[in-house]
Regions:
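Carbohydrate-interacting/catalytic domains
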Residues: 1-29, 37, 43-53, 319, ...
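Active-site/binding-pocket entry motifs
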Residues: 37, 65, 299-302, 434
Length: 548
């Protein structure tokens, strides 16, 4: 069957015109990772993403595949969307409606290997045409699939054309390249004697290096703003530096180190965590070595039940730690990716929406992700208390955000934190809010900084810090508080810039096609405020892994 992919009438012109803005890496990027098989309809997916305020969705491979057990990661037909979820037009409609809702689309793409089917690319003309020439080195050491021969001009043209095809014909906004390690290293998964060194006697796949540079250069030239993401665990240096600097030119790479350290730390009993404090703080030693996407995705934690099983404590404590992990990720430098169950409990659904809302409303949480000036430790060595505190910043002091994270199983009633300047500190988010299933240990009143030295700072505030929770504050310097009302109002407007991604797209959520339930709520000028007035303990909440 042949489909006419050019017949579809796209309605995402405004989005496509503005896509180039992602090249500056100063836009908020919050990704929801999912597979199309999880959803009953395109409308259901679009409505969920719009309501939860994600900026992007990352879809598991949509290119046609034969074996369901691979999850799509053994691509059979590179130029065809899988028929499992509908027709070519159905997929185009999905992307179109996502764009009209202001949501970017990132596709998982597999340029490292292909499956061994006689009807596929294996020995396409009876000879090893697409795979490596040496049969022993052509087999993927872990999956048994075939590795591409990147020294072949035909293979390079095939893959580069395919990447451009998905970006230009199906309007994909990004490609997440799977298993990049298998491309870069000749000895990947092999013992000595099972691989042949390159001409310099080392293990780098020189053909793959040149292919990736050429691929990323061509895609960027033809499709400005397209996000190129690498999953690579071999610590290849400067993977996200530019091709002009003789590097590979990816926009981002998954931060596997951050995820591994955090999950190992959270797996410890809170009583023992003081001995593993470096796993919580080490990430800032390498946070600026690459442009990272922090991930708590399906490969990292599985389902919510799987995530809970990795954590110590009661059901209530497990739920609190899941919220804390997501909140800490959103506050840490780097883009974000998560994959909570689509049928997550209502409390967690509200939590994720408010978390995204806070992220989008405060430029300090994304504008300087890749610059040292965007982050400052306040409390780095409070390992006895299992607490860390830090600031996220922009060039404007009034946009500073203060985050305090308590990884201990006990709350702190009068906890002192040093602050950067005299002024007002207002809690804008607390993971222990009762509406999220927490105990309500929140700070309802604005905190005025007092002149009392703490954390080697002249001023400090005293706050309530929930057990296994995160409290986030905006900071308004005293100088701004004293400004005339009209000028102060103008400053407040600059603080609360929200969702530049969707505004730039020229479409609001309510403009999504009528097939999608209109979402009339807009991103608030500030992150949601704490509404609970009581602080008493409440009964244990239901497990976050329960179905609604």
């Amino acid at each position: 069957m042949v489909a006419d992919v050019s017949a579809f009438q796209w309605n995402d012109g405004d989005w496509m015109k503005e896509r180039h803005r992602f090249d500056d890496r100063k836009q908020p990027v919050s990704i929801y990772e999912t597979s199309l098989e999880e959803w009953k309809s395109a409308e259901e997916l679009v409505e969920f993403l719009a309501e939860e305020d994600f900026t992007h969705v990352e879809l598991h491979p949509v290119m046609e595949y034969l074996d369901d057990i691979t999850g799509g990661y053994s691509t059979y037909a590179y130029y065809a969307p899988t028929s499992r979820f509908g027709s070519v037009v159905d997929f185009q409609k999905l992307v179109d409606e996502l764009h009209q809702a202001g949501i970017g689309v990132i596709l998982d793409w597999t340029p490292a290997q292909f499956p061994r089917y006689a009807s596929g690319l294996e020995k396409f003309d009876g000879t090893p045409l697409y795979e490596r020439q040496n049969p022993a080195e052509a087999i993927h050491p872990f999956w048994g699939t075939l590795l591409y021969n990147y020294g072949s001009p035909m293979v390079k043209d095939f893959l580069i054309s395919n990447a451009c095809f998905w970006a230009e014909v199906y309007h994909a906004d990004g490609l997440r390249m799977d298993d990049v390690d298998a491309m870069l290293y000749l000895d990947y998964g092999r013992n000595p004697g099972e691989w042949t060194p390159n001409i310099y006697g080392t293990n780098e796949n020189l053909d793959a290096l040149e292919f990736l540079k050429h691929l990323n250069s061509v895609i960027k030239e033809r499709n400005p703003g397209l996000l190129l993401v690498a999953q690579e665990n071999g610590l290849w240096p400067e993977l996200t530096d530019s091709v002009e600097n003789d590097h590979l030119g990816f926009d981002y790479k998954w931060s596997g180190g951050w995820t591994k350290d955090l999950l190992e730390y959270l797996s410890k009993d809170p009583i023992e965590r003081k001995n593993y404090h470096d796993q919580l703080t080490m990430s800032m030693l390498y946070a600026y070595c690459e442009h990272y996407i922090l991930t708590l995705g399906s490969r990292d934690v599985g389902t919510l039940k799987d995530f809970a099983d990795k954590l110590p404590g009661s059901e209530e404590q497990k739920n609190a730690q899941i919220r804390e992990a997501y909140a800490y990720m959103m506050l840490h430098p780097g883009c974000k990716m998560m994959a909570p169950d689509k049928d997550m409990p209502k409390e967690l659904e509200v939590f994720v929406k408010d978390l995204n809302n806070m992220y989008l409303a405060h430029p300090a949480l994304y504008q300087l992700d890749d610059e040292y000036d965007g982050f400052e430790w306040v409390q780095l060595m409070k390992y006895e208390e299992n607490v860390i505190a830090f600031m996220r910043k922009t060039e404007k002091p009034e946009e500073t955000v203060l985050a305090v994270c308590n990884f201990a199983a006990i709350p702190y009633e009068n906890y002192n934190v040093g602050v950067p300047f005299a002024g007002k500190y207002k809690e804008i988010f607390n993971s222990d809010d009762k509406k999220y299933g927490g105990n309500g240990v929140v700070n309802t009143r604005v905190k005025a900084a007092k002149k009392a030295e703490c954390d080697e700072r002249e001023y400090s505030i005293t706050l309530k810090l929930p057990a296994l929770g995160v409290a986030v504050f905006t900071c308004t310097p005293e100088e701004i508080e004293k400004k005339p009302a009209a000028e102060h109002s103008q400053i407040k407007k600059s603080i609360t810039k929200t969702r530049t991604v969707r505004k730039a797209a020229g479409k609001t959520k309510a403009a999504v096609k009528t097939a999608v339930k209109p979402v009339t709520k807009k991103v608030t000028k500030e992150a949601p405020q704490i509404v609970n007035k009581t602080e008493e303990k409440i009964p244990v909440k239901k497990d976050l892994t329960e179905k609604k």
